[in-house]
Amino acid sequence: MAKFYKIWLIFDPRRVFVAQGVFLFLLAAMIHLVVLSSGLNWFEAAAAVGGQ
């Protein structure tokens, strides 16, 4: 673990962080679209449980 810094000699840190940001954004967008396209509705379920 002490020589882990050498990974940045192989990979350019800017490209790694940009790629990580793009990946996380696309993953979040995909998760949101999957949840929105499902029949799951937390508001109606909470109202049914709460009796409102």
Swiss-Prot record:
Its membrane topology: Single-pass type II membrane protein
InterPro entries per record: Antenna_a/b, Antenna_alpha, Antenna_alpha_CS, Light-harvesting_complex
Chain sites annotated for binding a bacteriochlorophyll: H32
PROSITE patterns in the cross-refs: ANTENNA_COMP_ALPHA (PS00968)
Regions that span the bilayer: 16-36
Main location: membrane
Record's keyword annotation contains Cell division: no
Subunit structure: The core complex is formed by different alpha and beta chains, binding bacteriochlorophyll molecules, and arranged most probably in tetrameric structures disposed around the reaction center. The non-pigmented gamma chains may constitute additional components.
Annotated family: Belongs to the antenna complex alpha subunit family.
Protein name from the UniProt record: Light-harvesting protein B-870 alpha chain
Organism listed in the record: Roseobacter denitrificans (strain ATCC 33942 / OCh 114) (Erythrobacter sp. (strain OCh 114))
Lineage: Bacteria, Pseudomonadati, Pseudomonadota, Alphaproteobacteria, Rhodobacterales
